[in-house]
């Protein structure tokens, strides 16, 4: 019924050697599926990429054919530099922003505003349970907004609408399903959440 989509994924590319990475990427291309991996999560990871491949992570992924898959998703992308943001902009590459996990693991603050400005689809995720302690998407939305403000040192940055878009249509675009879900439109699936606003915890709404 179209509710299940299968992607190929390596949680971290370092969990496989180069041959294994290549096989996984080739599998995604062969079967026409998306490919997902965690990348540029920690600063030490970037250093390891440069040691192994002689270049930053996104450029190493380009050499492996990661961007030639039908759709590629990168979780975290905390340590992307401007050249990497430019590289993935305009390609079928998206980012899963995991703000609470990035705080818990002291990974850093992802340059989300730069990615959005470059037109890169960004959705909001939670990462795994041990990296987060819960799967509360409303908490993720709040923290995404707060971290965006802290990153830019601007209280007006990453406002509620920016975060709501990432949590809805942004996430749908990130997985290539924005034609089906992510916004309330005629012909789309009724992917709707109702929230009570008449409770103390929802004040000032």
List the predicted regions and their residue ranges.
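Histidine/acidic residue-rich metal-binding segments in metalloenzymes
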Residues: 1-94, 106-122, 139-142, 179
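Residue-level marker of alpha-helix boundaries and capping positions
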Residues: 14-15, 75, 102-103, 158-159, ...
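Short, acidic/turn-prone active-site loops that include or flank metal/cofactor-
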Residues: 41, 99-103, 128-130
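His/Asp/Glu-enriched, well-ordered alpha-helical/loop segment
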Residues: 63-69, 113-199
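Short glycine-/small-residue-rich Rossmann-like dinucleotide-binding loops
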Residues: 78, 99-100, 198
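Short, surface-exposed loop/helix-turn segments at secondary-structure junctions
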Residues: 200-205
């Amino acid at each position: 019924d179209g509710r299940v989509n299968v992607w190929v994924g390596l949680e971290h590319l370092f969990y496989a050697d180069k041959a294994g990475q290549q096989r996984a990427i080739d599998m995604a291309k062969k079967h026409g599926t998306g490919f997902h991996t965690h990348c540029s999560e920690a600063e030490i990871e970037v250093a390891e990429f440069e040691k192994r491949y002689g270049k930053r992570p996104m450029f190493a992924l380009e050499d492996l054919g990661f961007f030639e898959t039908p759709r590629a998703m990168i979780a975290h992308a905390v340590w992307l530099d401007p050249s990497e943001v430019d590289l993935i902009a305009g390609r079928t590459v998206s980012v899963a922003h995991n703000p609470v996990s990035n705080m818990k693991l002291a990974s850093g603050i992802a340059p989300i505003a730069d990615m959005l400005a470059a037109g890169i689809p960004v959705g909001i995720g939670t990462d795994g349970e041990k990296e987060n302690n819960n799967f509360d998407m409303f908490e993720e939305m709040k923290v995404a907004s707060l971290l965006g403000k802290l990153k830019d040192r601007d209280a007006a940055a990453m406002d509620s609408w920016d975060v709501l878009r990432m949590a809805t249509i942004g996430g749908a675009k990130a997985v290539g399903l924005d034609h089906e879900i992510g916004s309330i439109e005629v012909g789309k699936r009724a992917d709707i959440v109702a929230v009570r606003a008449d409770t103390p915890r929802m004040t000032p709404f």
